[in-house]
């Protein structure tokens, strides 16, 4: 298969093409495909035009009824949720551990450990640089079925350097499972399923289902959660981490996630862009932060309902168990979450 190009229909002042150099290099992929989909399968080149479409549609604009519009911003203040963070903090250790860089590296295995060992050697040799926090953006080589997905937006991957991951990860990685347990204690039941195997998840779901006489399950799906994570949402999330670690370096590393600078070096040119907010794929706290924000938001809605409920979370996908007769109490969730910048679909 040969890679495809993209038609760019949007622009943004924070995206700048630094220059187009060289010739377009067509990506090639080899795959075994069934006859009925062969002519409809395609994937995108790692080119400037594809990157421009991906950046505009995945960072700055969302598709509305009348075309593309800016991504919604929060209309409610996240300070309204601070009391929940305070309650959550009580369920955390007084001072969560901070790993050494060596302990962080040793927590990985295989090729990832080798990559972090090389990054640690770099840090010891030249120290941490601001450029380590820049996003190094490329297009995911993902196959699409053109029959079921008409003109899909390319997916972008936005990692920072392994050196940055080590610097911030010594704080975040040992904290992650402690936060998940604290969320369970806040809710008074097992909520965060992210670390559970399939058997444990099934056991939890079956247990909650059996608690209700006429059970109903409502799935909550956040539309492009990472894109809708505003600067305000990140500040709220980061404030929780900073309650436990007041290290100025840690605060500075988190700030780099809120005021982001990215570069996309494509085969036919390069792009520089800036964006406030938005979750970057590959950040050490992507899973942790998404769980934290979604759990706090949903807890804020559920805590005062005059009915029995159970909540489960697996990142930005989550669900609620209630009695069928109480389903109407959940109808306000989309409006509630949208006030904090998140577009939700109820299933």
Question: Model-predicted segments: where are they?
Answer:
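Viral RNA-dependent RNA polymerase
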Residues: 1-347
């Amino acid at each position: 298969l040969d890679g495809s190009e993209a038609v760019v229909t949007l622009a943004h002042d924070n995206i700048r093409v630094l220059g187009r150099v060289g010739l377009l290099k067509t990506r090639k992929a080899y795959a075994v495909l069934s006859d009925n989909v062969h002519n409809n399968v395609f994937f995108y080149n790692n080119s400037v035009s594809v990157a421009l479409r991906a950046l505009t549609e995945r960072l700055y604009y969302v598709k509305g009824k009348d075309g593309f519009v800016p991504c919604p911003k929060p209309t409610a203040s996240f300070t309204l949720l601070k009391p929940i963070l305070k309650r959550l903090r009580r369920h955390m250790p007084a001072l969560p551990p901070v790993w050494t860089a060596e302990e962080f590296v040793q927590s990985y295995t295989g090729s990832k450990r080798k990559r972090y060992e090389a990054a640690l050697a770099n840090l010891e040799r030249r120290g941490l640089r601001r450029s380590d926090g820049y996003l190094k953006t490329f297009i995911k080589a993902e196959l699409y079925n053109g029959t079921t997905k008409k003109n899909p937006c390319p997916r972008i991957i936005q990692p920072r350097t392994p050196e940055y991951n080590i610097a911030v990860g010594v704080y975040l990685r040992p904290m992650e499972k402690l936060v998940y347990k604290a969320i369970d204690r806040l809710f008074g039941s097992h909520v965060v399923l992210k670390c559970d195997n399939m058997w444990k998840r099934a056991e939890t779901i079956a247990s909650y289902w059996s608690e209700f006489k006429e059970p109903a399950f409502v799935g909550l799906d956040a539309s492009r959660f990472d894109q809708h994570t505003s600067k305000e949402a990140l500040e709220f999330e980061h404030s929780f981490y900073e309650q436990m670690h007041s290290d100025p370096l840690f605060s500075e590393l988190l700030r780099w996630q809120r005021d982001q600078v990215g570069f996309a070096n494509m085969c036919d040119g390069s792009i520089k862009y800036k964006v406030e907010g938005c979750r970057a794929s590959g950040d050490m706290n992507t899973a942790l932060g998404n769980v934290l924000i979604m759990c706090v938001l949903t807890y804020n809605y559920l805590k005062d309902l005059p009915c029995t409920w159970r909540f489960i979370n697996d990142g930005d996908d989550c669900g609620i168990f209630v009695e069928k007769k109480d389903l109407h109490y959940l109808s306000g969730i989309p409006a509630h979450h949208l006030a904090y910048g998140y577009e939700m679909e109820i299933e």
